[in-house]
Regions:
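Glycan-recognition and catalytic cores of secretory/periplasmic carbohydrate-active enzymes
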Residues: 1-414
């Protein structure tokens, strides 16, 4: 296995480029600080404003805790109070003190009392990063989140996460989602590192094998998103709601990039810990990246990555979402680190050129979260600018090794 192979003229080894990434990350952090509300963090509009009545939500809060933990570990001022604020919200109003787990909003004020794997994966990720940052209360939160993942969501017989439950943990949803298992894989990689337990890497491998090596390989290496409880694909799922923000119809090229990066992290982590490393991890990562580029990039007459494709790999929802470019650039960086092959340098520079030209909002701050097919700001799928996590990680990942969690890697660099 080639470890962190970088050409001498690569942007990955360029000090000015690394400084540019750092500066871009700082700008993103400064914008996101306005999202603080009494019970956690809320979503911001495209101007960086939040309404006085804007509610906190658990996914945003968990992602902010994770992101500000990464910043605090680097020694960036002003982040520790934000981490502690988010941890207090996750330990308090966002938590179900009766049945355990977390609501989507404080005290389930939005009426949604279901417990979702996607959300709980982010709570565990936030707690793990806050623990590395040494914040009070993070260890207790991490223990509780891990217990919920193990006792409620992890299905040993499936080698994957169950999707959701009713508030009292009855009514297990018959749907299985690649998206929640993808973020579960991300979280399990962090847990293996922070808890020093190989078990989480074995579970991550089982999820990746099911979703990617078994199913995506049969779909041109574009991840199939939706399955029934027996892991049979649901090709018509949300055909009448193709632009859903979490469960869109068809295939999602952006998730191909994201999975490609995660497979490389998994490969490196398993090698570092002396665990068996399947050859398909690298092979599938290459294929995922190639397919996402072939079918997602510049396929409708303009630059950018379309949100979704149909089963013939034709664009369905042509909006360009910011997280897809963040993940594309990070995947290119990971493959460049892993292989040293020049084509990944070309893609890495191409994606960041696009981000700089189209995504970065130099008038109001942060990144446009959505552009239409003419690369003009749009709010069809995602209103406002609620997300720090994807873009901020994109500024960090190219500067860090593949093998350990972001939080631990940043701590080692200090």
């Amino acid at each position: 296995m080639t470890d962190l192979t970088r050409a001498s003229d690569s942007w990955l080894t360029s000090l000015p480029h690394q400084q540019w990434l750092h500066d871009q990350g700082q700008t993103l952090l400064d914008f996101a600080k306005a999202a603080r509300v009494p019970f956690g963090f809320a979503q911001l509009d495209r101007f960086g404003r939040r309404a006085d009545t804007a509610p906190a939500d658990t996914i945003t809060t968990a992602r902010m805790v994770h992101s500000f933990s990464l910043a605090h570990i680097q020694g960036l001022p002003g982040c520790a109070p934000l981490i502690d604020h988010g941890l207090a919200a996750l330990a308090g109003p966002l938590r179900d003190t009766e049945h355990g787990g977390w609501f989507a909003s404080p005290h389930a004020q939005d009426g949604n009392t279901r417990k979702a794997a996607y959300l709980h994966a982010f709570v565990a990720l936030a707690a793990s990063s806050a623990a590395v940052a040494g914040r009070g209360g993070s260890a207790e939160l991490l223990g509780d989140a891990v217990a919920i993942l193990e006792d409620r969501f992890w299905a040993e017989d499936e080698g994957a996460l169950r999707e959701s439950f009713a508030r009292d943990w009855s009514d297990c949803e018959t749907y299985r989602g690649a998206n929640s298992n993808m973020h579960g894989t991300e979280t399990f990689l962090a847990l293996a590192d922070v808890l020093d337990e190989d078990l989480w890497l074995d579970r991550a491998l089982r999820m990746a094998e099911r979703v990617i090596h078994q199913h995506a390989a049969d779909a041109d290496f574009l991840p199939i998103e939706h399955f029934d409880a027996h892991w049979r694909p649901l090709p018509d799922y949300n055909r009448d709601n193709p632009a859903d923000g979490f469960r869109p119809f068809g295939k999602t090229p952006g998730h191909g990039f994201e999975w490609a990066r995660l497979l490389l992290h998994l490969e490196a982590a398993r090698q570092q810990r002396g665990l068996p490393v399947p050859e398909w991890l690298l092979g599938d990562a290459r294929q995922l990246f190639a397919s996402a580029c072939q079918f997602g990039w510049n396929v409708d007459g303009g630059p950018g990555i379309v949100y979704t494709l149909d089963w013939d790999n034709r664009p369905v929802v042509r909006e360009r979402l910011h997280w897809t470019l963040a993940e594309a650039s990070a995947a290119a960086a990971a493959l460049l680190q892993r292989t040293g092959e020049p084509m990944y340098e070309v893609w890495y520079q191409r994606f960041w050129d696009y981000i700089d030209l189209h995504m970065i909002d130099r008038q109001y701050g942060s990144w446009h979260h959505e552009l239409d097919h003419d690369n003009l700001p749009s709010e069809t799928i995602w209103p406002g600018k609620p997300d720090l996590y994807h873009a901020y990680q994109a500024t960090l990942l190219p500067r860090l090794p593949l093998a350990i969690s972001l939080a631990s890697a940043l701590k080692l660099r200090r």
